[in-house]
Design a protein with these regions (language model features):
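Divalent-cation
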Residues: 1-158
Length: 158
């Protein structure tokens, strides 16, 4: 939501049960721990990694500048841009979109697009049971991960 405030566009694909290797290969390997600072640095305008999607596997950003299939769903609003169409097009994963034009956050899940969502809705969807993202045989705790990202945004007491 910090990126939305400054209208920095983003396309964040959260890998679920289906491994997204074919899309990962279209981008640049990152293999960095998922933090708000990493996301801000990747999607900063006029930087080499800002175009395309990132793929999140477990608690890591595995690749950036990835190409995704665009949805050809004619029911989608004509005012939606490429990021939103790509988010709906990759139905194998949950995808978070930050609009560069409006700063609004949307979420695509299983071909459905939830537009202009608030932080609570996003947290709820990320913590629901259908996100069975497994890393090293363990269920990823999305609530804990969201708390860690939030803590990374807070200034330290040092």
């Amino acid at each position: 939501y910090e990126m939305g405030k400054v209208k920095t566009g983003a396309l964040i694909v959260v890998e679920d049960e289906i491994v997204l290797t074919e899309y990962e290969r279209t981008g640049i390997a990152v293999d960095g721990i998922l933090t708000s600072q990493l996301l801000i640095n990747i999607f900063e305008k006029n930087t080499p990694l800002h175009d395309g999607a990132i793929i999140v596997r477990g608690n890591r950003v595995v690749a950036a500048t990835c190409y995704l299939p665009l949805s050809d769903n004619l029911a989608l609003s004509k005012d939606l841009g490429t990021r939103h169409r790509a988010a709906v097009g990759i139905s194998e994963a949950m995808t978070i979109v930050v609009s560069e034009e409006t700063g609004k956050v949307s979420l695509a899940v299983e071909g459905e697009l939830y537009r202009n969502i608030d932080e609570e809705f996003l947290k709820k969807k990320l913590s629901e049971g259908h996100l069975k993202n497994v890393e090293n045989g363990k269920l990823i705790d999305w609530k804990r991960r969201l708390q860690n990202v939030k803590k990374a945004k807070e200034p330290s007491d040092k």
